[in-house]
A protein has these predicted regions:
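Mixed-charge (Asp/Glu-Lys/Arg
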Residues: 1-76, 81-180
Length: 180
């Protein structure tokens, strides 16, 4: 049994035009909100649902065969899984962050730690792509960490592994070593 089999997964079906959480163009005009304001106003669960629908309906050209929303307590850093081939374990991982301000390194270091630990322990395979979706953008200091092909981010992750990241990951922490 794979680790994915132990999760309760509901496949995302093709969205209907009369989905209750979607506003018609007329409703959008009447409520006087721009699309971005509407995106900012939804809660984190609705945001994850939106990403699932988006992955299903808009990214079909990427070759996804199945899309699942996992986001819940104990999701091991997996909010949305979009599979190219579930049998082979080929998938993209979408990490959704709906915060009131720009995403910072502190907001995300625990999630990156989970990705490293759970892929290292073969709890789930390394995703083809790891996407971080956050409507409020990312902080400039986080953008700076991503420069240099992520070398600055790797250095910070190494420096904060024992003192910060393992605490955020919880009981599944591992010591940082050359293999990891």
């Amino acid at each position: 049994m794979s680790n994915l089999d132990s999760l309760v997964l509901e496949p995302i079906e093709q969205p209907l035009s009369n989905t209750p959480n979607m506003l018609s163009n007329e409703d959008r005009v009447l409520c006087n909100m721009t699309p971005l304001q509407r995106l900012y106003s939804i809660d984190e669960d609705t945001y994850e649902e939106l990403v699932c629908v988006w992955a299903y309906s808009c990214l079909g050209n990427k070759g996804y065969t199945e899309v699942y929303r996992v986001g819940q307590a104990g999701d091991k850093g997996r909010d949305v899984l979009a599979y190219y081939d579930r049998v082979k374990g080929a998938f993209d991982l979408y990490q959704c962050k709906q915060y009131k301000s720009a995403l910072t390194y502190s907001d995300l270091c625990g999630e990156m730690g989970k990705l490293l630990i759970y892929t290292f322990n073969n709890t789930y395979p390394i995703p083809q792509n790891y996407y971080i979706l956050c409507p409020k953008d990312v902080s400039q200091s986080f953008v700076d960490l991503l420069s240099n092909n992520g070398k600055n981010l790797k250095i910070k992750l190494k420096n904060y592994w024992e003192t910060v990241i393992n605490k955020k990951v919880g009981p599944n922490w591992v010591a940082l070593n050359e293999e990891l």
